[in-house]
């Protein structure tokens, strides 16, 4: 049992270190810049409207659906602000979560337009197009399923550009459609682009304010192309002018943060160039630019894209574009976290409470692992039975480690005992534990999800540290109920303090994760008693003695 505990402590410390290291890799603090970064254009060239003077501010058009509140600037038709109406900014707040923002302290915009030789957003024009609209406010009415916001711009040559935003009830995917009416006698060449730009360094009002690593996930850019399903792109990489430039026939670009994302998905057939760019002043951009489209004289042409602005809801994102659901950051154990989440969501559909769903999933996992757990305790019981022989062997062979090792292996073989048999369930539990951690920290469905009593957010730490203390108590009982062969006083002290060490580690872990571990420990206590009864009948265990 002592080797099992030592392995468990080492494995847990290793997992904790890996969590910390993963956070450091993706979310290391970024130094504040005091001077403007040199503006380096990506290979996409004029796809980015960098440094183009506004030539006067446009009007703000407000748009409201049942889930979104947007501010659209008629200068370029960019979305300057987006609020998620069904997601509060903080637990207990009546303020909706602010995703896109255009203020002096922070910039996060979703831009789109038509560039290229004849595009109205071509930097050579000196200004973004100034659109007009028939009204300043659009709102989705009761019973209405779709809301359309048409913006119109007529160029000096008479060409009319209509930019229409299409929003649907309950949806975070926004259609952005362009209709080009070429009334001239000459063909036009345009390219559609979609771009996300954001201030790299977070101001205080955008920061979570958390000082512990357990509450951070990746914040930065990401993209998908024909060559790669999903690739992160750090803001620091863009700041260092190491820019992305790749051509693909499909894909998307995105900016990510914990629980929420924005993404541009091109919908027009043909190739697109995906790019990143350092826009200067501490602002990074990621976007796409379509291949040139020729609009014949006297004809019309339509171009389209989809903009995702909202929570990272996996099934809805997957319906918008292939692999867009991969933006949910489940870390390197995504292949375990995703099935766990699907099972958890399935259970929640019946139970209606995420906390009780976690309890049920714990019973399911431990039930599946019961044969391994039984084998683990049986192996440890056999190892305890061999302790007198092993101790006699140590006294007889002294410091001859090589011979000691050989005779011990021969003894294990003769007695049909696997010395590592007690470790397998622990090895299996560690990835499940870590995958559950990633699932809790990456699934927006668990953000602000209440359980019971004082636990109002399963994805956040217990504010009163009651669950971690209960977890430590269950570990203490497991330790006291488990036979041990430890005789060294120092090792005994270490074993005694293990529940305390684990309790301290769990203080800052998500409540849902601690809940899982408490229930898992309670199941361990129950299974332990059932298994020990069977071992007693086989003469492999005695309740009267704690030491073999």
Curated annotation (Swiss-Prot):
Its main location: membrane. The chain crosses the membrane at residues 6-26, 345-365, 420-440, 458-478, 499-519. One of its GO terms (cellular component) is plasma membrane. Pfam families: 60KD_IMP, YidC_periplas. Interacts with the Sec translocase complex via SecD. Specifically interacts with transmembrane segments of nascent integral membrane proteins during membrane integration. NCBIfam families: PRK01318.1-1 (NF002351), PRK01318.1-3 (NF002352), yidC_nterm (TIGR03593), yidC_oxa1_cterm (TIGR03592). GO terms for biological process: protein insertion into membrane; protein transport. GO terms for molecular function: membrane insertase activity. Belongs to the OXA1/ALB3/YidC family. Type 1 subfamily. This is Membrane protein insertase YidC. Required for the insertion and/or proper folding and/or complex formation of integral membrane proteins into the membrane. Involved in integration of membrane proteins that insert both dependently and independently of the Sec translocase complex, as well as at least some lipoproteins. Aids folding of multispanning membrane proteins. It comes from the Bacteria. Keywords: Cell inner membrane, Cell membrane, Chaperone, Membrane, Protein transport, Transmembrane, Transmembrane helix, Transport. HAMAP family: YidC_type1. Residues 30-53 are annotated as: Disordered. It is found in: Cell inner membrane. CDD domains: 5TM_YidC_Alb3, EcYidC-like_peri. It is a multi-pass membrane protein. The gene is yidC.
């Amino acid at each position: 049992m002592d080797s099992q505990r030592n392995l468990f402590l080492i494995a847990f410390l290793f997992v904790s270190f890996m969590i910390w290291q993963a956070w450091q890799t993706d979310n290391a603090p970024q130094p504040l810049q005091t001077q403007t970064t040199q503006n380096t254009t990506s290979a996409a060239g004029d796809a980015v409207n960098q440094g183009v003077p506004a030539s006067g501010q446009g009007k703000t058009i407000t748009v409201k659906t049942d889930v979104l509140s947007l501010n659209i600037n008629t200068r370029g038709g960019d979305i300057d602000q987006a609020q998620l109406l069904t997601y509060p900014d903080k637990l207990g707040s009546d303020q909706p979560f602010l995703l896109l923002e255009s203020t002096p302290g922070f910039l996060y915009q979703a831009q789109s337009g038509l560039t290229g030789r004849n595009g109205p957003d071509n930097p050579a024009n000196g200004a973004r197009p100034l659109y007009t609209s028939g009204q300043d406010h659009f709102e989705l009415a009761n019973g209405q399923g779709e809301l359309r916001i048409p913006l119109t711009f007529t160029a000096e040559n008479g060409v009319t550009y209509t930019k229409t935003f299409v929003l649907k009830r309950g949806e975070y995917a926004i259609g952005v459609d362009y209709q080009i009416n070429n009334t001239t006698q000459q063909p036009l060449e345009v390219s559609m682009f979609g771009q996300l730009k954001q201030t790299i360094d977070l101001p205080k009002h955008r920061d979570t304010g958390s000082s512990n690593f357990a509450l951070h996930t990746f914040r930065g850019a990401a993209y998908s192309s024909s060559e790669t399903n999903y690739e992160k792109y750090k803001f620091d990489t863009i700041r260092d002018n190491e820019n992305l430039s790749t051509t693909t026939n499909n894909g998307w670009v995105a900016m990510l943060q914990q629980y929420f994302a924005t993404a541009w998905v091109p919908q027009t057939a043909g190739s697109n160039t995906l790019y990143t760019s350092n826009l200067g002043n501490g602002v990074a951009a990621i976007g796409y630019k379509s291949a040139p489209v020729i609009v014949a004289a006297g004809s019309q042409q339509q171009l389209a894209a989809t903009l995702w602005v909202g929570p990272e809801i996996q099934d809805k994102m997957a319906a918008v574009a292939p692999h867009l659901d991969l933006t949910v950051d489940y870390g390197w154990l995504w292949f375990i976290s995703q099935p766990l989440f699907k099972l958890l969501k399935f259970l929640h559909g019946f139970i209606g409470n995420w906390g009780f769903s976690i309890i049920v999933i714990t019973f399911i996992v431990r039930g599946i692992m019961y044969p391994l757990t039984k084998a683990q305790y049986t192996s440890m019981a056999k190892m305890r039975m061999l302790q007198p022989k092993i101790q006699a062997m140590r006294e007889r062979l002294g410091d001859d480690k090589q011979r000691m090792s050989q005779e011990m292996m021969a003894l294990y073989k003769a007695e049909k005992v696997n010395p590592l048999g007690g470790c397998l369930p622990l090895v299996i539990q560690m990835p499940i534990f870590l995958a559950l951690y990633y699932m809790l920290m990456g699934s927006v469905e668990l953000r602000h999800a209440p359980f019971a009593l004082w636990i109002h957010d399963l994805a956040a730490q217990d504010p009163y540290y009651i669950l971690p203390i209960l977890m430590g108590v269950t570990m203490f009982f497991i330790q006291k109920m488990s036979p041990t062969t430890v005789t060294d006083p120092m090792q005994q002290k270490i074993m005694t303090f293990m529940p305390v060490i684990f309790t301290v580690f769990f203080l800052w872990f998500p409540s849902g994760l601690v809940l899982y571990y408490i229930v898992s420990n309670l199941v361990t206590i129950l299974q332990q008693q059932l298994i020990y009864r069977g071992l007693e009948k086989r003469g492999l265990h005695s309740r009267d003695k704690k030491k073999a």
